């Protein structure tokens, strides 16, 4: 896990990181909220994230993977940063076209990127889609790990999990 005070400050400056009383999608209460979709629409922050991710990806991957919606800008930016192609993972099966949940390369080794990890549910869903296709996932990278169970949930996959920022980095300083 990388402590990244510069990224933390950028998230605050663009108002993607807010402090106060919030109710999360899970129904849990939190004293902070991270809107990574807001951050990923800022080119400077997106470049910073992709640069940090590029330093953490294994050398031998064939493509980068990210679940729609939040991870797609991150996968695209990392692809542009590294020259490695990317794949988008659909949240559900399509009833038309190919019906595939993957758009892009689907053979070889990949790194999975995501914006925020809370309980690890969406990360596990993405992993399951990739693994069912016979894709080897070599690492999971997230921008923010809220430290609410994602690393524990994902431990059973035996795939390295790393974040740029953890919940302890986000405390109101």
Regions found by a protein language model. Name each.
Residues 1-57:
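Active-site-facing substrate-recognition patch
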Residues 51-62, 127-133:
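Phosphate/pyrophosphate-binding loops at sites that engage ATP/ADP/AMP, CoA/4′-phosphopantetheine
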